[in-house]
A protein has these predicted regions:
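Charged interaction scaffolds used for protein-protein
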Residues: 1-204
Length: 204
């Protein structure tokens, strides 16, 4: 398969390294420095997006326009006991007619979009969240052990998702959230992208 050029595909410059990271060529290995640079490029691109939904849309548009790979998220309506409704992502699939040769590259690009924040970034967002919420449970993040746990939770999710979750909770939570609440908020924001990544990995 011929490598697509960035000049013709319109792929955002910050994720060029990640898009090409489909694995080392036979007989070669990728250095830790290269991997770190790839992750930093992906992280920077994610954090430059308006929100996780916008990042997901940009990724899907890029996959379709530059690689000929179309993926769709399957959703269902959920009706909470408290009333109202929400749209829940329940699956994803690669559409028929997608360019099979480019599926590994598409999967690599989506893997890059799962890059988590650095520990320093996660801790900075937690400090912001702590400052925005009232006392009570806020003291849970007061010790080094608690901060480590909270930061570790955020680092399991894409960088933009982790930041968006902290921003959302800062605007809606009265008390500093529990670890379970932060995890649940991140899970909801990351569900579509994780399903897309899984579908592409399976297809590739």
């Amino acid at each position: 398969m011929q490598r697509l050029s960035f000049e013709t595909t319109g792929i955002p410059a910050p994720v060029r390294a990640v898009v090409n990271s489909t694995g080392p060529r036979p007989g070669t290995t990728r250095s830790c420095v290269t991997v770190a640079a790839d992750e930093e490029a992906a992280r920077g691109w994610l954090l430059a997006q308006p929100d996780p939904a916008a990042a997901d849309k940009a990724l899907l548009t890029s996959l379709a326009s530059s690689l000929g790979v179309e993926v769709t998220v399957e959703t269902e309506l959920r009706f909470p006991v408290g009333g109202g409704f929400r749209v829940q992502a329940v699956g994803a699939r690669v559409l028929p007619g997608s360019n099979a040769e480019n599926l590994p590259l598409a999967a690599a690009r989506m893997r890059g979009a799962l890059t988590g924040p650095t520990k320093d970034q996660a801790e900075d967002w937690l400090v912001m969240l702590q400052a925005a919420t009232a006392g009570g449970r806020k003291s849970e993040a007061g010790t080094a052990v608690a901060l480590e746990l909270y930061a570790g939770c955020l680092m399991r999710f894409p960088a933009d998702v982790a930041k968006a979750a902290c921003m959302k909770l800062a605007m809606t939570a009265t008390w500093f959230p529990t670890l379970a609440e932060i995890n649940a908020t991140c899970e909801a924001l990351a569900s579509s992208r994780r399903l897309l990544a899984h579908a592409l990995e399976q297809a590739a």
